[in-house]
Amino acid sequence: MGVAARPPALRHWFSHSIPLAIFALLLLYLSVRSLGARSGCGPRAQPCVPGETAPFQVRQESGTLEAPERKQPPCLGPRGMLGRMMRRFHASLKPEGDVGLSPYLAGWRALVEFLTPLGSVFAFATREAFTKVTDLEARVHGPDAEHYWSLVAMAAWERRAGLLEQPGAAPRDPTRSSGSRTLLLLHRALRWSQLCLHRVATGALGGPDAGVQCSDAYRAALGPHHPWLVRQTARLAFLAFPGRRRLLELACPGATEAEARAALVRAAGTLEDVYNRTQSLLAERGLLQLA
């Protein structure tokens, strides 16, 4: 007995559903309106992410992964995108325990540059991240720049000036969000990026593929802040995720698989350090519920 062919209409629908789903998900990925409207957290509530070490730091995940001894792969060198991203984010960690906004945003620019070639799922996400980065950079270099040199300074200034939103309330005009709220949205996206890269690097052969692992990371870091429709769209979008081997090749060109995995673990560790520092500062100031 033969297998009936799919009707042309069904094939046509399916061929367009994946790109459409990716577009719908990632257009809303860092959307101020969707995240703000769906918080569901009160002003005194704990962070909404289940399993998070709330309200402070996440558990350290990005341990070492050793590659055979060899010269450092180019992706971690002075001209490598991965190395450039790590150095900029690391520079944002101030000795006094603050987070410098200028190097943090420079790190995000490098992260966007790094993620964009990895596939359409990342490409749409990074467009929204780039918008948020540009918005914060305008404040860092704007007329109130003296108040936007670090996370602590920004939060203190916006509180004094009455610029902070009510917890869980989306601003009527997304373009007028506080810098603290915009940073919170980037902060959550950084957690997803960190988890995804770490799981791509450490996934075992024969285990869940990269799409499944990054989908799980989405559910942990961003899903609790998204409405049901966006979460369902995400599930479909991750079906188009590149395979692990392809991601490793794109992330660290010219390196062996072991070297690429080790490089990604180091990069994920840097992102985790920045996330933990930022998480603590936001929690101490009651800013985790701004969106």
From Swiss-Prot:
Any one GO cellular component localisation term in the record: cytosol
Name the InterPro entries for this protein.
GLTP_sf, Glycolipid_transfer_prot_dom
User: Where are the glycosylation sites?
Assistant: 276
Single GO molecular function: ceramide 1-phosphate transfer activity
Q: Classify the source by domain of life.
A: Eukaryota
Keywords assigned by UniProt? Glycoprotein
Pfam families given in the database record: GLTP
Q: What is this protein called?
A: Glycolipid transfer protein domain-containing protein 2
**Species this protein is from:** Homo sapiens
What's the gene? Answer: GLTPD2
